[in-house]
């Protein structure tokens, strides 16, 4: 389980302060996918980085499986698989070599690394390029490799920032099907996205975020009932209009 409790984060430069996350709270349960849905610059990535121990909040706290992300970052990292929207992989290595490297970083045994590599390669349809250099792979292949790397240690909590961004239809389908399977294995999954179809296909619950504030947190059915609509796009635009940010979407 993941708990986010009243977190805020402000970034400062010489000219101005930018409030990236403003008093934001939500929780994500096992065997579910929670989606943070919002336009670019809404605060989705900052929120995920705070949960994943890569940033510290100015206020509030986050916890993963009962471990505080600030106080117990090592324990949190053991239990999460985090995929950034701009994850960079070494172009000189192969996916197989990367998986071994990250498996060793997670103190896995050789036999477990080999077994897990085989499982992930089959799950993500990677066998044809497992021994090819990352620098020679397509965008979709690189994304699959990045997903596999983030999951090599079989984490209990999965946090993916824009997991289908920039992917072709077939690769995006592979990724969404994979996440559904993982959810059904009892994992806690949080994703960020600005793509409505991804949220509709995957999420048990969505949090809609504008200007760093979580303005709605509900099931899709709950949102449809509340706003008198039967699709997520119309709900989203009604909320954007209400919040005065319709120009952003």
Question: What do these predicted ranges mean?
Answer:
Residues 133-137:
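Conserved ABC ATPase signature
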Residues 217-218:
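ABC ATPase "signature
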